Amino acid sequence: MKAVTYQGIKNVVVKDVPDPKIEKSDDMIIKVTSTAICGSDLHLIHGFIPNMQEDYVIGHEPMGIVEEVGSGVTKLKKGDRVIIPFNIACGECFFCKNQLESQCDQSNDNGEMGAYFGYSGQTGGYPGGQAEYLRVPFANFTHFKIPESCEEPDEKLSVIADAMTTGFWSVDNAGVKKGDTVIVLGCGPVGLFAQKFCWLKGAKRVIAVDYVNYRLQHAKRTNKVEIVNFEDHENTGNYLKEITKGGADVVIDAVGMDGKMSDLEFLASGLKLHGGTMSALVIASQAVRKGGTIQITGVYGGRYNGFPLGDIMQRNVNIRSGQAPVIHYMPYMFELVSTGKIDPGDVVSHVLPLSEAKHGYDIFDSKMDDCIKVVLKP
């Protein structure tokens, strides 16, 4: 089959790889019909994630049609249309039973964190979904079955696998409530979805921060938010604190280590002393009010010097963070899409054949052609 493979830093290649096979009784194989490129995939190609091997199949936002099921799969059959979450989870351990399936104890033998598709040996080493076919472990739990009556196109549903649901979880986990002022750092797909959900939760004011003008304008046009370009201000954190009269109730960091790096951070990252940048988190620590909440959703890797712990602790700021446990949220996300309460279609800017994955990665990474979200079609 054809698949998108990692071949080194900033080098992805579509090539032939072996077809996946049923390995355990609760596995299934899906024929992938759509698969998206995620912002966290960029961390892989930038070299920020360890244990990446050449020819590893990447991608973790797939959906498709069930092709084959193992003997232990009872909840699905051949021909079912499914969305596959980025979490791989057993459904039976303590964490899965307590709605923290992103930390499943049974799916990743390689570390403390949970398992994810296509995200290196660190997260289980499972081949990813940017391919013609995908093996799905723990298939009875690791899926959302789309009702047969659904006529929504893939482009509106594939984002439920990660970006849309992670955006909702960010807002939910941060405790955004009616009347809150919320700052969302980042106008990539997760940040854009988080902005939508802030309004759904009753926020009275939502401010989006980025430095890419077309993304800021997209946020303003589609999400009706205030926008701030951080390059227009010498100290963006203090500026945000000033315009919110003491800071926001909640600041959501939807950027992570992929923000703009200083020369020193660039050097440290190249030497593997530092994973990207902490610039978004520093802004968050300055822009949040006393007793407010910082929600860290953007991915960070490793340990960091310069973490503003004293500023956070002295002002009674709460920190919430983690990888979104998307599986138990997926039915609600589907309901929001199918009833028209949320339209994820405006986040998907490009639909390309799988064969053009390299181009998709290039425009997404370089922020060219007004790219916001790329969906690949095998």
Curated annotation (Swiss-Prot):
Zn(2+) 2 binds at C90, C93, C96, C104. GO terms for molecular function: oxidoreductase activity; zinc ion binding. Binds 2 Zn(2+) ions per subunit. Its EC number is 1.-.-.-. Disruption phenotype: No aldehyde-stress related phenotype. InterPro entries: ADH-like_C (IPR013149), ADH-like_N (IPR013154), ADH_Zn_CS (IPR002328), GroES-like_sf (IPR011032), NAD(P)-bd_dom_sf (IPR036291). It comes from the Bacteria. Zn(2+) 1 binds at C38, H60. Its cofactor is Zn(2+). Keywords: Metal-binding, Oxidoreductase, Zinc. Signal peptide: none annotated. Pfam families: ADH_N, ADH_zinc_N. PANTHER family: DEHYDROGENASE, ZINC-CONTAINING, PUTATIVE (AFU_ORTHOLOGUE AFUA_2G02810)-RELATED (PTHR42813:SF2), ZINC-TYPE ALCOHOL DEHYDROGENASE-LIKE (PTHR42813). Belongs to the zinc-containing alcohol dehydrogenase family. Class-III subfamily. This is Uncharacterized zinc-type alcohol dehydrogenase-like protein AdhB. It comes from Bacillus subtilis (strain 168). The lineage of its organism: Bacteria, Bacillati, Bacillota, Bacilli, Bacillales. The gene is adhB.
